[in-house]
Structures are given as C-alpha cells and as structure tokens.
Amino acid sequence: MKLLENHNVILTGASRGIGRGIALKLAEQGANVAFTYLSSEAKAKELEAELQAKGVKAKAYHSDAADYKAAEQLITDVQADFGKIDSLINNAGITKDGLLMRMSEEQFDDVIKANLKSVFNTTKAVQRAMLKERKGSIINITSVVGIRGNAGQANYAASKAGIIGFTKSVALELGSRSIRCNAVAPGFIETEMTAVLDEKVVAGWREGIPLKRGGTPEDVANAVVFLASDWSSYITGQVLQVDGGMLT
C-alpha cells in the first residue's frame, strides 16, 4: 500500500523546482494534491495533468499565500473540492538577494511577507479544519540558510529562521490535538534555477558537501512524504536537514 493513500494535501508554490518535485512524489505515494501557483498557469495546468495521470485527484489554485484573505479562501475552496485536509506543505517563497548595505526596505519586506507571513497565513487558516479532525501534519520548507545564515541573504535567512521558530511553536500549541508540525531544511538543491549557473562554481559547491553532490527535488520530496505519513507519527517540532551533510 502507498504511504499516502486517500491523503489530501495542500501544497503552496508547486509549479516548478522543489515544489514540483514534492507534488509528483506525493501523487506517486497516493496523495490527492491541491497546489497553488502565482505565475505560469500553463505550467500549473501541465503539472495538474501529470498528477491526475498518476490516478489521484489534483487541482491547481491561483492563490497568493502571502495574502491573508487569499489564504483563508484557499482553505475554504480546497475543503469544498477535496473534503478533509490531512497535510499542509508550505513551500512558496522568493529570494531578493543583496548585501545589507544595498538592501532596500522593500526587498526585506517582500521576502519576509512571501516566505514567512505566508506560512502564518495558511497555517492559521488550516488549523481549524485539522482541529476538527484532531489530526494533521504541517510541513514547512525552510533552508540551511535559516540555520547558519548567508552573506547577501539577510532577508532570506531571517525569513527561513523565522519559519523554524514558528514551526516549533505551532508543534507545542497543537500537539495535544495530534497535529504535528515539522520543517524540512534543504541544502544545495539542483533545479532549473541552478542549471544556468557557471559549472565551475557549482562543482565547487558540490566538492564542499560531504556526499559530493547536490541534492535533487526528489531528495526533499522524500523527506516531505515521510513527515506527511504515519511513519513519522511521533515526530513533531523538528527540523530535518536534507543537505548531504553540508552543516555537519
């Protein structure tokens, strides 16, 4: 039997990269997937069809998780379309890198809103449904940058570190209702975004990782599936690093 048979999942930011990889792996394990996108409707519809071809229910929602009212509406719409919600995976996020000296207030605020406030919005909106069921798994995608920081990414690091603190607090608040909350912290993950980088630079990054390779979206997705499933039923408030040993 598949790990997530008849499991209904909401996944934010799924049309490309890590989010897309998570969506595909969820469907492979039997989950019905409600996912959000902001930019390309064509890519979203393409993913929707791929997921449905795996024999699960899937639907794309054009929704901005950083907008509180939109997040509330998303949960309402997914409940109407799918019924109960078993897992929420907060993956949506952006980067607007720059050294602190040159970083604008807008750059900082935009990243905090898209990466951190979005997690608050969707988690707050979904908790009522999960409290009613007295069960649920919330999984927040953070980053190794949120653990150790990174020059030129003060805004991004702050948002991802905030997600870790938020995750642990939610785990403490909702644990008595059998609602778990964990985070996944990817390291260097090779996606279409990294494919355009100089190969020598990428090779240097790989060499600095104990496993001597970059990760894949599937590596992250495997961790997410584990945390969404009953195999992790006694795990909450944790940060699972998927980084090839980068921070070891």
Which functions belong to the PLM regions below?
Residues S143:
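Residue(s) in the substrate-gating loop at a strand-loop-helix junction
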Residues R128, L172-S176, S233:
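Alpha-helical segment proximal to the catalytic Tyr-Lys
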Residues A183, R206-W231, I235, G244:
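C-terminal helical subdomain
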Residues N8, S15-G17:
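Conserved glycine-rich cofactor-binding loop
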Residues A31-E46:
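Conserved glycine-rich Rossmann-like NAD(P)H-binding loop of the short-chain dehydrogenase/reductase
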Residues T123, S159, T167:
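Active-site helix of classical SDR
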